[in-house]
Regions:
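Condensing-enzyme catalytic core mediating Claisen C-C bond formation in acyl metabolism
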Residues: 2-72, 188-280, 375, 386-390
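Short beta-strand segments
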Residues: 20, 102, 133, 158-164, ...
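Short acidic, glycine/serine/threonine-rich loops at helix termini
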Residues: 30, 110-112, 143-144, 169-174, ...
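Claisen-condensing/thiolase-fold acyl-transfer catalytic domains that form or cleave C-C bonds
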Residues: 72, 76-80, 105-107, 119, ...
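Short glycine-rich phosphate-binding loop at a beta-alpha junction
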Residues: 94-102, 301-310
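Acyl-CoA/ACP chain-elongation machinery
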Residues: 154-176, 232-240, 313-314
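Short, flexible helix-coil linker/hinge segments at the edges of structured domains or between repeats
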Residues: 167-192
Length: 390
């Protein structure tokens, strides 16, 4: 049973609404057969993992801000483009008080991703800034800051965005030194599955939301009923990481304590994932957290019209469904909505991208209730949003 920091229901001054949503997906979609043309061959060899991973993850097309060995957009540009899509002449960009962004894949360590996005937007004013660094939950963690600021009366509006630029991290050139080193050691020259696996899972894009203290006068809005996050890093060691190597005791040694030679030989800056840990814990801990939220908010299946699960792979749909049933929250297939096969796994942008498609394709009607689930495997964090269409 999850123990919450406070079992006292939070009383905010006023409700908060998601009134506009926007996404930006770079270039044309890339099919499964075209992936290695964009990402390249490591050591000149086709990936052994590619066909297995793609067969399980259910992704048919995805988007890359990368063509012919060069970037077409930076992460900052992806995020800025998605945010610009929220605004028009009737509601200018300068109307926002807060910029709340999250990403797994910034271009630089310092300054923050949010600072770079603020600069790229060309807003003719200073804004309050929150820039969350993590993986899939980072955008929602930033969103919570903005929600609380508006709810408490500190701000009137905020732009939130999740964005990812993973293609350059996944390009074959990033793994060549390690593959060449393995060949010299008379090994097979194939990089480890924990690294190659993610090359066929992650892709690029951005999605943004506008938060305001009042709903749209014309058209639908999402009212945020509640938003909860949690970390289980006190219980579980790291599962997905970059810029470090994982030691036998489960600890990490960061890039700044490794030699420059090791950075390339071990592909230290590649994204790696312990798939055994992922399978053992990611669904179970998410269900544990949700069970506590069900009790806290009296959440039952009949109070959910749409369930939006962020999944890295369709492989997890069955385990998630079984876990929900085990905690007493059976959600029928017709209530599930996700766009993973069409847009791919876009990390921190994925939750917003589902909400954007659900709203902007007119699938929802006033009164619909939506549960959004965002698991993060990095060190097992989770976010749940419960929304009502108003």
């Amino acid at each position: 049973m999850t123990i919450f920091a406070s079992q006292i229901e939070r009383k905010f001054v006023r409700p908060v609404y998601i009134t506009r949503l926007s996404k930006f997906l770079p270039n044309d979609p890339v099919s499964n057969d075209e992936m290695e043309k964009v990402l390249g061959l490591v050591n000149g060899k086709p990936s052994k993992a590619r066909s297995i991973v793609l067969r399980n993850n259910g992704i048919k097309t995805r988007y890359y801000a990368f063509r012919d060995g060069k970037s077409t957009h930076s992460n900052v540009e992806l995020c800025a483009n998605a945010i610009r899509g929220l605004f028009d002449e009737a509601l200018p960009l300068e109307s926002i008080d807060i910029l709340a962004v999250g990403t797994s894949s910034p271009e630089q360590v310092i300054p923050s991703h949010g600072s770079m996005v603020h600069g790229a937007l060309g807003i003719n004013k200073g804004v309050e800034l929150i820039s969350a660094m993590g993986t899939c939950c980072s955008s929602v963690q930033a969103l919570k800051y903005a929600q609380m600021a508006i709810a408490s009366g500190i701000a009137e509006s905020a732009a939130g965005c999740g964005s990812e630029k993973m293609s350059t991290w996944m390009h074959a050139s990033r793994f060549e030194p390690e593959a060449e080193n393995l060949t010299k050691l008379e090994e097979n020259g194939y990089i480890a599955f924990e690294k190659d696996f993610l090359r066929w899972m992650l892709s690029d894009g951005a999605a943004a939301v506008l938060l305001q203290s009042k709903p749209n006068e014309n058209g639908n809005s999402y009212k945020i009923e509640w938003l909860e996050t949690i970390s289980y890093a006190n219980e579980l060691e790291t599962c997905m990481y970059a810029g470090a190597v994982k030691n036998e005791d489960g600890s990490l040694t960061g890039w700044n304590d490794l030699s420059i030679e090791d950075w390339t030989k071990q592909s230290v800056f590649s994204v790696k994932q312990d798939t055994k840990m992922l399978a053992e814990h990611i669904v179970k801990k998410g269900g544990e957290f949700l069970q506590g939220l069900m009790q806290k908010y009296n959440l039952t299946s009949d109070k959910i019209d749409y369930f939006l699960p962020h999944m890295s792979s369709e492989f997890f749909k069955k385990p998630i469904k079984e876990n929900l049933e085990s905690i007493g929250l059976e959600i029928n297939n017709e209530k599930w909505f996700y766009n993973l096969p069409r847009v791919g796994n876009v990390g921190s942008a994925s939750a917003y991208m589902m909400l954007e498609e659900l709203m902007n394709t007119n699938k929802v009607k006033k009164g619909d209730r939506i549960l959004v689930m965002v698991p993060e495997s990095a060190r097992f964090s989770y976010a749940y949003l419960y929304l009502t269409v108003v």
